[in-house]
């Protein structure tokens, strides 16, 4: 049986008097739709359901300041509280109720897999005014910025009145047309371009075309903006201009611009110099290139990258290795989400392939021991640039770089120690680096042909790098104990843990190459190693038991 407007109104009044406010509102709206006593019904709905919530709506709308918006009083839509998280939409212009908007529907959306995989970048969509039709898009605004091109901006803006939408609304920006959308990104080149587009296929392709145009503009000197670079991909390169060009060929495929830069510090003067010269002619403003017409040490070349970088974080990558572009979405999300990070160690295909779970270590001893002596390979290390320079690295370089063999070979590994006092440390199990083949044999041959000699740290002995010989490892271990003692600053418990870790690491490294030595050589060097360790421990007021001493020698000789 279909009730008349009068019957519905009488029913609504009875329900309201009995405290069934939700049922009453449904009946009031139905009576209004029957064109019965519309003025009286609307006035009572506003008085009974809206008046007590007006200030909350106004405050919620006022908190949204992402772009230009319609004045509150001029918004065409009002929202009548119906039940928890649900509102009747009333259109003041056409004087009709236009359905129910449910916040619960937005909150209950199951995220699409494509949205999960695109963790960081903003999205864009062309839509009409009715947010009820796009819960999947709205729900994404909890995780990322969402740019809406709305054909009816006034009505679209009105939804910002709803208090429960605040966690979504804070990331939403609305444009009245595609031209306004493009103008915003053309003028605000520090804002990150959206990478995903939603909507009808033709409209989606139209947005993608605009985004591609603006991306191309941002690769020009005129369109380049470094104000909000989140990640610098830093490449300290040495005598391998041919490899650098391959690395850039890969990197330039990425869709990022304002988020990213490529900082390159060129080192060496002998090999592949023409290839290096060609880098400056590559038409990509993301490239920040500095060439030295001299030979720097590997560490100072790395620090040169840190000096020229603009990013909040700097990813160090060898000119032998490629960045896995598809993994950058994840790492950009990580770097933008964890505000206390000082360093990230990313998983790589070879050197750090055993990182099978993500581990987060808080600033201090936890961060120190979480990554201590695990940074021998530089590719995949991500440093917070400002914290790097505040960590005291220059002081340590001046004190130990020239005269301490451990620090001289592994200053990048010691950086993790220094940064543990500056912030948190993260090991992440998403693979970011694909290691390439070693360029050593090519460099060796090229140097031989040109009459140049290899740098000391690149020379080999017994078919292994000079720094990996037992003689060198013993010297490094002795010097490492000095660095540890200095850093611990009287904290005996911390010093003991670091010394134990260092001892285990050195023994492990020596065992790896023990087949390069005759038994008599091993015996002599093993005893020298233990004696040097004992001398240092005694000097620091610590000891090594005879059982431990015999155990170490046994491992090295077995």
Language-model region placement:
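Short aromatic/hydrophobic "clamp" motif used to bind/position activated sugar donors
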Residues: 314
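Conserved nucleotide-sugar donor-binding catalytic segment
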Residues: 365-464
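Conserved donor NDP-sugar-binding/catalytic core segment of glycosyltransferases
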Residues: 326-359
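Acidic donor-binding segment of Leloir-type glycosyltransferases
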Residues: 250-291
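Glycine-rich, basic loop-to-helix element that forms the pyrophosphate-binding segment
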Residues: 292-309
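The conserved acidic donor/metal-binding loop of glycosyltransferases
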Residues: 318-322
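C-terminal subregions of glycosyltransferases and related glycan-biosynthesis enzymes
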Residues: 2-7, 11-14, 20-37, 46, ...
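Short, well-formed alpha-helical segments that are part of the catalytic scaffolds
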Residues: 240-254
